[in-house]
């Protein structure tokens, strides 16, 4: 049968750490959580959009791999002719590529730009809908699924900044 019980109880307490201590604690927790994910018996890569979240993940990974004498491989994604047809909006005020280029230069990654045309994207629309079992926002899921299928040919472990926007304002 079914039963109803509480797994946990969230309580709110005042944050008493100083700003400096908070910054250091968050830095430690983020770095530690990323470094734990790159312990792997197969090569690891990252998705790099140039935003805050993927830049943090890629930067930490690149530094850790450099300590091991390895170079991080990063991937970014764009749509064919995006530089021609791009229109700024609230969701994406600028193109990603200039920020990707800055991060690649900063962390020294081996970077690959992957491009998707609209027919490839259309091929993944139904699969992405079926995977989520519901419609989602624009082409985000279908494009991610398409690009993951390309990266999966070389890498089995990929770290991303997905879902960190809400935490870091990316």
Predicted regions and their residues:
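Non-catalytic substrate-recognition/targeting regions of SAM-dependent transferases
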Residues: 1-9
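ATP-dependent adenylate-handling active sites, centered on carboxylate activation for C-N bond formation
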Residues: 9-170
């Amino acid at each position: 049968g079914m039963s109803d019980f509480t797994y946990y109880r969230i309580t709110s307490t005042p944050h008493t750490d100083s700003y400096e201590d908070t910054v250091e604690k968050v830095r430690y927790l983020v770095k530690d959580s990323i470094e734990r994910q790159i312990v792997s018996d197969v090569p690891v890569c990252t998705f790099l959009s140039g935003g805050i979240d993927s830049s943090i993940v890629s930067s930490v990974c690149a530094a850790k791999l450099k300590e091991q004498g390895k170079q991080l491989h990063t991937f970014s994604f764009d749509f064919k002719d995006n530089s021609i047809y791009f229109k700024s909006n609230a969701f994406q005020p600028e193109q990603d590529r200039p920020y990707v280029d800055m991060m690649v230069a900063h962390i020294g990654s081996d970077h690959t730009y992957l491009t998707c045309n609209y027919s490839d994207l259309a091929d993944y629309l139904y699969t992405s809908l079926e995977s989520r079992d519901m419609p989602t926002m624009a082409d985000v899921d279908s494009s991610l699924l398409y690009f993951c299928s390309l990266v999966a040919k070389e890498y089995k472990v990929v770290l991303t900044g997905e879902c960190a926007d809400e935490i870091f304002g990316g």
